[in-house]
From Swiss-Prot:
GO terms for molecular function: cAMP-dependent protein kinase inhibitor activity. GO terms for cellular component: cytoplasm; nucleus. The record marks 23, 26-27 as: Important for inhibition. It holds the Pfam family PKI. GO terms for biological process: positive regulation of telomere maintenance. Residues 1-78 are annotated as: Disordered. This is cAMP-dependent protein kinase inhibitor beta. Extremely potent competitive inhibitor of cAMP-dependent protein kinase activity, this protein interacts with the catalytic subunit of the enzyme after the cAMP-induced dissociation of its regulatory chains. Keywords: Protein kinase inhibitor. Residues 1-10, 53-78 have a biased composition (Basic and acidic residues). Signal peptide: none annotated. Belongs to the PKI family. Residues 33-42 have a biased composition (Polar residues).
Length: 78
């Protein structure tokens, strides 16, 4: 299938972007990854992981659901 050379397809534009980026492959992407990750460090990792805990949220939700069920018996829901 031939296309008009003045029109670029999505693939061709991606190839042109890659060629103009001066990256020859995956190995050249490694410094990009390392530079963005190296700024954070791991010293604050335990604090970040602690902030991600969802156990308390789930416990509070279960307690609220239980409390709602006690306040409104099942026969009133129908």
């Amino acid at each position: 299938m031939r296309t008009d050379s003045s029109k670029m397809t999505d693939v061709e534009s991606g190839v042109a972007n890659f060629a103009s980026s001066a990256r020859a492959g995956r190995r050249n992407a490694l410094p990009d990854i390392q530079s963005s990750a190296a700024t954070d460090g791991t010293s604050d990792l335990p604090l970040k992981l602690e902030a991600l805990s969802v156990k308390e949220d789930a416990k509070e939700k279960d307690e609220k659901t239980t409390q709602d069920q006690l306040e409104k018996p099942q026969n009133e829901e129908k």
